[in-house]
């Protein structure tokens, strides 16, 4: 096979020729001649005369000697002396530029260099004495810009903008910025466009996209924060790169040829990183999933595939699996993709069930599914399970915690009078136990559906979707009398997520600045694990148990929690009995675990106080509205 011309010659180690190596090295040596920064620094390419008069030249000569002696010690008298010299001149801003041009490091400004010191000092003088800038003409402003345009020092650039009134000559600077853009200085041009308020002069493919391509997302976001008119089209453009049949690089390859000196990161120009950027920008700027259809499609496909894997591992029961799939497979493309995925996974009976349920055209189905349906008919070929049939044997179901209260103690609250009675009873309690269930959203915020509050004798399942019956005043009363009541201890597990969803979804007006009446059992459990020899509980030592709620239940109560209904359609009304029992057990088990720890751990009160003291829901994400 012919070798490509750009491939390296493979020479075994030790057989290299010194002469050949020297020739290769010499051919790669380049001498770069730095052009005098004064050349073409003025308006219309005029040169800048940086010649110092005799007095200024003598001062600068002596000052350079002092700088070389004292600069590393950062002696404050240097800045004072230099400032006095500038103030003694009739045009301090112009003198500073001349001295800057005579600095040996003026073509390569560093933060601790003499050239940086000169401009930084004159800018600070201007800040203290604004009248110094009154005589600054456009040519002086242009010279100042040309001196610092490629420094990359944002603080210095912004100081020069104010001291030398660069915003007054923005129209003259725009062609200069485009020259920098042609030379591949995307970062510098973006910073200048933001500082000079010129973001509207560039389109999204000139700055925003190349910044993404070189992995400068924070700067791209800062640019979009100012270029408000580009946010929506840019997010739509990035979403268009998330094609289900073509790669990101393939879709934007024709665009990359227009950029010069662009060091592209091929990592970011791939599906997963680009999808994260689309999701981040859409969330930041408040765009709904209608703006990002490609991202929503691929994200939903992945979620549907995940649901089947969870069902296959018996982590979801059949009813939960099918009702959640019915909600999220909302269009023809998602449905056909899901049926094809099931067929490729060998789940032919389930694929045929959804083929029938979705009423999919046979030509859109995999060949094996179409063949089975045509031979046996949809009903016979599928042989699907009844939604009421569980896939776990009775011996395995005995492992799970069951409800120990009668049905009349499981109270569904979806009317105003029921809510009032519940509120009265809750105010009599010293400790209550909280949990919540929400409907998973693929791209947006999760929808709170049920709030569970358990007491010693009842479990209240509050319907958070009963908006007509339960109004804002009901939720405010619940927040004021229960959640913000310091005399009622609220016990939960991983309460950050629950409180965050509650804050966002309901007008409870929670006051979480001093959450000393909340106890997170997860924090309590982790504190117990810090004990040197652990803590013995009725069914094991805490150090041999995991950190999930089902692990606490097993160690304290001897039974696990059946999570097969956790991921189900909690927005469906009425709820299935299995959902009601699952939600009630989740809250009830908190009380049983709490009581067990109180009884079996002699030093539990000290651990509780320590756990409560560590609460910081505001920092962790439960934001106050």
Swiss-Prot record:
Cofactor or coenzyme needed: Mg(2+)
GO biological process: miRNA processing; piRNA processing; pre-miRNA 3'-end processing; primary piRNA processing; secondary piRNA processing; transposable element silencing
Domain 3'-5' exonuclease: 410-602
Phenotype of gene-disrupted mutants: Homozygous semilethal and sterile. Mutant flies show accumulation of the longest isoforms of multiple-isoform miRNAs including miR-3 and miR-34.
GO molecular function, one term: 3'-5'-RNA exonuclease activity
Keyword tags: Exonuclease, Hydrolase, Magnesium, Metal-binding, Nuclease, Phosphoprotein
Pfam families found in the cross-reference section: DNA_pol_A_exo1 (PF01612)
InterPro entries: 3'-5'_exonuclease_dom, Exonuclease_MUT-7-like, Mut-7_DEDDy_dom, RNaseH-like_sf, RNaseH_sf
EC number(s) from the headed UniProt entry: 3.1.-.-
In-chain residues carrying the UniProt-annotated modification Phosphoserine: 17
GO CC entries: cytoplasm; nucleus; P granule; ribonucleoprotein complex
SUBUNIT field: Interacts with AGO1; the interaction is not RNA dependent.
General function of this protein: Possesses 3'-5' exoribonuclease activity. Required for 3'-end trimming of AGO1-bound miRNAs, in particular multiple-isoform miRNAs, which represents a critical step in miRNA maturation.
Membership in a protein family: Belongs to the mut-7 family.
Name of the protein this chain belongs to: Exonuclease mut-7 homolog
Organism: Drosophila melanogaster
Classification of source organism: Eukaryota, Metazoa, Ecdysozoa, Arthropoda, Hexapoda
Name of encoding gene: Nbr
């Amino acid at each position: 096979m012919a070798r490509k011309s750009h491939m390296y010659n493979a020479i075994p180690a030790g057989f290299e020729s010194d002469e050949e190596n020297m020739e290769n090295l010499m051919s790669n040596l380049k001498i770069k001649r730095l052009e005098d920064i004064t050349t073409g620094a003025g308006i219309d390419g005029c040169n800048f005369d940086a010649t110092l008069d005799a007095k200024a030249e003598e001062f600068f000569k002596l000052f350079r000697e002092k700088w070389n002696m004292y600069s590393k010690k950062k002696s404050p008298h240097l800045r004072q002396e230099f400032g006095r010299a500038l103030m003694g001149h009739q045009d301090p801003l112009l003198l500073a530029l001349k001295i800057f041009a005579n600095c040996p490091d003026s073509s390569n400004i560093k933060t601790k260099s003499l050239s940086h010191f000169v401009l930084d000092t004159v800018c600070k003088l201007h800040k203290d004495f604004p009248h110094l800038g009154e005589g600054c003409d456009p040519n002086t402003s242009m010279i100042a810009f040309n001196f610092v345009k490629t420094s990359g020092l944002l603080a210095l650039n912004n100081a020069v903008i104010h001291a030398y009134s660069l915003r007054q000559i923005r129209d003259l600077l725009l062609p200069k910025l485009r020259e920098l853009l042609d030379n591949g200085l995307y970062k510098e041009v973006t910073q200048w466009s933001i500082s000079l308020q010129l973001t509207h002069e560039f389109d999204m493919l000139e700055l925003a996209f190349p910044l993404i391509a070189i992995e400068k997302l924070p700067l791209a976001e800062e640019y979009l924060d100012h270029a408000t008119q580009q946010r929506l089209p840019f997010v739509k453009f990035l979403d268009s790169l998330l094609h289900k049949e073509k790669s990101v690089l393939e879709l934007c390859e024709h665009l990359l040829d227009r950029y010069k000196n662009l060091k592209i990161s091929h990592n970011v120009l791939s599906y997963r990183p680009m999808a994260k950027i689309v999701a981040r920008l859409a969330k930041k700027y408040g765009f709904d999933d209608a703006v990002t259809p490609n991202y929503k499609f691929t994200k939903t496909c992945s979620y549907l595939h995940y649901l089947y894997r969870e069902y296959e591992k018996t982590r979801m029961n059949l009813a939960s699996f099918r009702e959640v799939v019915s909600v999220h497979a909302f269009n023809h493309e998602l449905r056909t993709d899901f049926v094809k995925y099931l067929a490729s996974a060998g789940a032919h009976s389930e694929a045929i069930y959804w083929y029938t349920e979705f009423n999919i055209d046979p030509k859109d189905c995999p060949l094996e599914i179409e063949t089975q349906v045509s031979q046996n008919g949809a009903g016979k070929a599928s042989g699907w399970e009844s939604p009421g049939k569980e896939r776990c044997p009775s011996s395995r179901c005995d492992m799970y915690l069951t409800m120990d209260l009668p049905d009349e103690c499981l109270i569904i609250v979806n009317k105003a009078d029921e809510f009032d009675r519940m509120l009265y009873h809750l105010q009599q309690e010293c400790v209550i136990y909280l949990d919540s269930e929400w409907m998973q959203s693929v791209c947006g915020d999760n929808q709170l559906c049920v709030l569970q509050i358990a007491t010693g004798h009842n479990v209240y399942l509050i319907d958070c979707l009963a908006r007509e019956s339960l109004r804002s005043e009901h939720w405010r009363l619940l927040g004021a009398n229960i959640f913000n009541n310091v005399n009622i201890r609220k016990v939960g597990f991983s309460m950050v997520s629950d409180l965050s969803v509650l804050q966002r979804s309901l007008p409870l007006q929670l006051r979480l600045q001093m959450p000393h009446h909340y106890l997170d059992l997860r924090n309590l459990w982790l504190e117990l694990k810090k004990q040197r020899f652990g803590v013995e509980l009725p069914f094991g030592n805490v150090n041999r148990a995991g950190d999930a709620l089902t692990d606490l239940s097993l160690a304290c109560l001897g039974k696990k929690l059946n999570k097969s209904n956790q991921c189900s359609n909690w927005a469906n009304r009425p709820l299935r009995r299995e959902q009601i029992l699952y939600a009630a057990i989740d809250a009830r088990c908190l009380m049983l675990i709490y009581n067990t720890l109180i009884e079996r751990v002699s030093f539990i009160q000290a651990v509780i106080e320590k756990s409560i003291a560590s609460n910081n829901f505001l920092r962790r994400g439960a934001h106050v509205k």
